[in-house]
From Swiss-Prot:
Residues forming coiled coils: none
Gene expressing this chain: GAC1
Protein name: Serine/threonine-protein phosphatase 1 regulatory subunit GAC1
GO biological process, one term: mitotic spindle assembly checkpoint signaling
UniProtKB keywords: Glycogen biosynthesis, Phosphoprotein
Species for this entry: Saccharomyces cerevisiae (strain ATCC 204508 / S288c) (Baker's yeast)
Compositionally skewed regions (Basic and acidic residues) per UniProt: 637-648
Length: 793
């Protein structure tokens, strides 16, 4: 039952609200001599409040001075509700009733907060008196009847305002509208900053936990795990507990969610599982409920829960658990949790044996991720960079910066050491050799007349001419300077590395460089040669480790055409077999015993008793092979000695001398002769035309300088050196017919290391006398085909 107490205004405090009040007062003074109080309605005794009289009197006096109505809904209720007396009853409700504290921050600037809700009790007379004294401070700006309250704060109420300020000081509260408004603006800025920080949180990462997960051990003797084995493993893992957390993972698609799986014993059908977790050592506790996930067996069920960190980030920021400063991109976050299991009116906990479960995480904000720095390779400047074109410099810069290469048009690229396996005779036209030592000055240049090119002087580091007959030692420090002329390139040849004697990228017709050594070659009137390379000079090296295995066609048969083809495949297609020129002197020191020693050393070293050092094509990228798997350079010895003798006798009758002055006419003009006389070519005569003898003073093939050496001619890339075996002792008779003014160098075979050696004793050929070699090739030699590398018949 609602009891409403009527209030009346005292005469001293009564103020007219309308202009006609003065007229009414004058009329009442004239008619009524004594003012009378309005009648007061009496209440029933059952409705009266049982309070002491002093309190009632004080209350009546207060009610007379208050423009508000105080309503008490029941005796049990102690909270006083206040509302404006001018408000309509429909607006008075529990939701719209004004409270002692402002509802929002907008009203906090103008309203006065005196007490908390717990401080205002109905039975405390002092608090109620103080409350009613300061009722005038309550805000009326939003009231519907503000027009009648404009004169509320006049001069008569200044004393009440002073009393109000003093009362605030007694309770430790001072009202200042300016400071309150300043605090409100600060709160607004703090709220906006908090929202910005919460928005900047973009990622959560779970690093580790102290949870021991449950792992099913595979069976030992069966493929599938039986129910009894699973039950035994679960019982061992639970270790007598009714609830056990066995999994904590972070979702892959949403990093802000942590999911957990809990095993509980099936003690009853109705179960309640709750997860309690905290971020600040249990000062603040958060709860999440676990739901049923699946049934493991009749004794164990599994529950699942999810912790959404995004829903808690505002609380974490307010509590300063997460701090996102400007200079930081991440913040550590630690979580502690435990499980509570309610079943059969009993509660069980899983708190990791009293230690709780810990999760160690990290929070990241937007823009805090450090970008991966792409390393830029800075190479030291070299001499080649100075002469590099801008286009090449741009290509090198782009290749060392992956970010730039992504935006450039992609094309097929190969590394510099790529082996193309190109067997085309024209491959040097499309492939630029990147070798630092073998670098031609001019590509695709053919010199038809080599007479105009003069060879460079021999190196001073070579042996002197006076030591021709002695033992020549190898000069390991003989490395010539880089090339300075366009027609001269000095290159070292390293025998241990099996470096090819070709100084270009082509193995068929290189136009970059060739060897100009002390050996002089010329052509006769009938054998035409065409020089196709510039003259260069570099020292010869050991031939004992020369690599014969890198041939393009290892399956060729032992035919005369194939053998001759492989021996000359490094020459230009128009070049014929070279012949020696000049006078040859007779060496009296050569006898039949030397020939026998030569045959014996060859029999000990080679199974086929013959070996031909040929200028064959080689793969530039496969120079390290030391195994000779090729069958093209091996020549089976002739079993018939009569054939050799016939060739010698026939060659002596048809040989004609040639001179070095006829080199200008060595260009081949007619190929028909080579085609017609191909069937008469006997390759055995070529083998018998050069003799090699054993010499004890020349252990190795060494480079030396010869003052009487003629310019190199007729060979495109390397000197053709043929090492043959004499089948009989009659071949030494050829050396006896050589003139003493012949070309001095000679080839020997050392008995110790069975290697071909170059000496200065004699290089036997037959120009002045009958020469079977020239007789055999009296006509034009056959022409090599560039495409198929076969005889062109």
């Amino acid at each position: 039952m609602v009891i409403q107490t009527a209030t009346t205004l005292s005469p001293a405090k009564a103020r007219p609200s309308f202009p006609h009040n003065d007229l009414i007062k004058s009329m009442s003074d004239s008619l009524i001599s004594r003012p009378t109080h309005p009648p007061i309605r009496k209440l029933k005794s059952s409705l009266k409040i049982s309070h002491p009289e002093p309190i009632s009197r004080s209350k009546s006096e207060i009610f007379c001075t208050s423009p508000e109505k105080n309503v008490r809904f029941a005796i049990e209720l102690t909270t006083v509700k206040r509302f404006d007396k001018n408000a309509e009853p429909s607006s008075i409700s529990n939701e719209n009733s004004p409270t002692l504290s402002p509802v929002d921050s907008n009203t906090a600037a103008d309203d006065v907060q005196l007490f908390n809700n717990e401080d205002c009790w109905f039975n405390d007379s002092s608090l109620v008196t103080n409350l009613l004294k300061n009722e005038k401070k309550f805000r009326y700006m939003n009231s519907l009847n503000n027009m009648f309250k404009l004169d509320l704060y006049d001069s008569e109420d200044e004393d009440d305002i002073d009393e109000h300020i003093n009362s605030q000081a007694e309770y430790g509260y001072t009202y200042n509208s300016l400071s309150t408004r300043g605090k409100t603006s600060e709160n607004k800025s703090a709220t906006s900053s908090l929202a910005t920080q919460a928005t900047n949180i973009c990622d959560w990462k779970l690093h580790c936990t102290d949870l021991v997960p449950f792992k099913i051990a595979p069976p030992l003797f069966t493929k599938t795990l039986s129910a009894s084995d699973l039950q035994g493993q679960l019982t061992k893992y639970l270790n007598g507990q009714n609830v056990k957390l066995h999994s904590l993972t972070q979702l892959g698609d949403d990093s802000s969610k942590i999911t957990g799986l809990v095993y509980v014993k099936n003690l009853s059908f109705e179960k309640y599982l709750e997860i309690k977790f905290t971020f600040n050592s249990w000062r603040d506790i958060h709860y999440v409920t676990a739901n049923f996930n699946r049934t493991i067996n009749s004794n164990v069920d599994e529950f699942k829960f999810t912790i959404d960190l995004n829903s808690l980030k505002y609380i974490l920021l307010i509590k300063r658990i997460i701090t996102m400063e400007k200079n930081t991109s991440s913040c550590p976050l630690n979580i502690e949790l435990c499980c509570r299991y309610d079943v059969n009116n009993e509660t069980y906990y899983d708190n990791n044996n009293g230690k709780n479960y810990h999760l160690f995480m990290t929070t990241f904000k937007k823009g805090g991720e450090t970008k991966e720095k792409i390393p830029v390779v800075v190479e030291p400047a070299s001499q080649t960079d100075a002469a590099m074109s801008p286009k090449e410099m741009k290509a090198r810069f782009v290749s060392s910066n992956p970010t730039l290469s992504r935006f450039l048009p992609q094309s097929r690229k190969f590394s510099e050491d790529t082996d193309y396996y190109n067997t085309s005779p024209l491959k040097h036209l499309y492939h630029n050799d990147t070798t630092s030592w073998v670098k031609p000055k001019r590509l695709n240049v053919v010199l038809d007349k080599l007479e105009n090119a003069t060879p460079p002087p021999p190196s001073s580091a070579l042996a002197n001419d006076t030591a021709r007959t002695g033992k020549i030692t190898k000069d390991k420090n003989n490395v010539l300077a880089p090339p300075t002329a366009s027609n001269s390139i000095d290159l070292p040849i390293l025998g241990s590395q099996h470096q090819s004697l070709y100084s270009g990228s082509s193995s068929y017709s290189s136009s970059s460089s060739s060897i100009s050594s002390s050996l002089s070659f010329a052509s006769s009137n009938n054998s035409s040669t065409n020089s196709s390379s510039a003259s260069c000079s570099f020292p010869l090296t050991e031939l004992d480790n020369f690599d014969y295995a890198n041939l393009y066609e290892p399956n060729d048969t032992f035919t005369t055409a194939n053998l001759f083809n492989h021996s000359l495949n490094s020459l230009m297609p128009e070049i014929s077999t070279p012949s020696f020129f000049g006078g040859f002197r007779n060496e009296n020191t050569i006898n039949n015993n030397d020939s026998k020693n030569l045959v014996t050393s060859l029999e000990d070293s080679y199974e086929d008793k013959q070996s031909v050092i040929t200028d064959t094509t080689m793969d530039e990228n496969n120079k390290t092979s030391t195994i000779n798997n090729s069958t093209d350079t091996l020549i089976k010895p002739s079993k018939e000695n009569g054939t050799v003798k016939e060739n010698k006798s026939s060659a002596n009758s048809t040989s004609a001398p040639s001179s070095s002055q006829n080199r200008a006419s060595t260009i081949l003009n007619d190929h028909s002769n080579g085609k017609s006389d191909l069937k008469y070519v006997n390759y055995q005569s070529l083998l018998d035309s050069h003799c090699f003898y054993n010499h004890p003073s020349s252990p190795n093939l060494q480079s030396t300088s010869f003052s009487s050496a003629a310019p190199f001619s007729g060979i495109s890339q390397a000197s053709d050196i043929f090492d043959y075996e004499n089948e009989d002792s009659d071949s030494n008779q050829i050396a006896g017919e050589i003139d003493n003014n012949s070309f001095p160098p000679h080839f020997y075979l050392d008995e110790d290391d069975k290697s071909a050696c170059l000496s200065d004793d004699a290089l036997i050929d037959h120009h002045r006398n009958t020469n079977p070699f020239i007789n055999t090739f009296s006509s034009s030699p056959p022409i090599l085909s560039q495409e198929v590398d076969r005889w062109r018949l």
